[in-house]
Each structure stands twice: as C-alpha cells, then as structure tokens.
Amino acid sequence: RSMAYSFPGQVTNDKYQYQYMFGDSLLVAPVVDVTKKMIDVYLPEGNWYGLFDNESYKSGTHTIECLMGELPVFVRKGTILPFNLNEKLELGAYVGNETESYKNLTFRIYPGEGVYLWYDYVNNCEVEFTSSTDSNEIIVRGLKIPVTLELIGKVDTIRVNGEDICGT
C-alpha cells in the first residue's frame, strides 16, 4: 500500500512517493535513482528497525546509506517475522523451494505490544506469540518443533510453553 493511503496526513511530500507498506509491519523504500548512495526515508509514527542491519529508528525523516543492490526495508516495533533460513541463519540466502519442511525455522522478534498467531501447516499446529511492554516479556505457546528465536532489542523474560528459556 502507498504511504499516503497507509498514513493519511503524515506523508504529503512527493519525495516519498515510492515508499510503500508491505503488510502492516514492513516499510519498503526502493532506490529509484541508481546514482544515489544516500536516500531520504520517512518513517511514520512509532519505532522502527532496519530489517538487514537491525538499527533502531524513531519516526521522522532519516538519511540512509544505500549500497548498490540493497533494498531498504524497515520493521515496525512489535512485529514477529517467521523466516526459513539456511544453516548459517543468513537472511536472504538460498534455502531451496521445498514447501513441506523448514531448513531452520527462525522467528525474528521485535519486542513491543501485541499478539501474533502463526499457523504451522507442516506440523498442523498454531503458535501464539504474546509480547508485552508492561511485563517486558515474550510468551510463546503451542510451539512443537525446534526453532530459533532471534530477539531484536531487550526483554526480561522469554517463556516457551510455560518454561523460561531466557531471563536477565
């Protein structure tokens, strides 16, 4: 969706006309001029993270370095993203086209407030992630297979199926 549609009244400058929302939590800022090494990106209200560098950003305009072949993508705080990654857990690396299994199922967690439901069609189960800023914890229910939980930011506790797996 276009930024003007997703955030009416916030984005009025044509400078950001190529930015768009991919779902509710990912903001994509394509580089349309290959001669530029820096681009201006507008991030709507809230906290954001760079998908590929995990840098933290506040809302507003930011000048971002953009190397050839890179696509700036930003993730809204409070998002949980599932990835099928290779053995080195590299984002964007080749994992094949298999749809009946996962190489290394990884959930990248950007702590915030909310509930995220994920249905595992391979193992026929639903997994619920609850993220709370009040208690500063992540609670995962229904997980039946080994996964990697990659935390971007800090929380006091991560609890999976009732068992604490991480705490400060």
Predicted regions and their residues:
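Catalytic core of carbohydrate-active enzymes
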Residues: 1-154
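Short strand-turn-strand beta-turns centered on an Asx-Gly dipeptide
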Residues: 44, 160-163
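Beta-strand-rich ligand-recognition modules
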Residues: 164-168
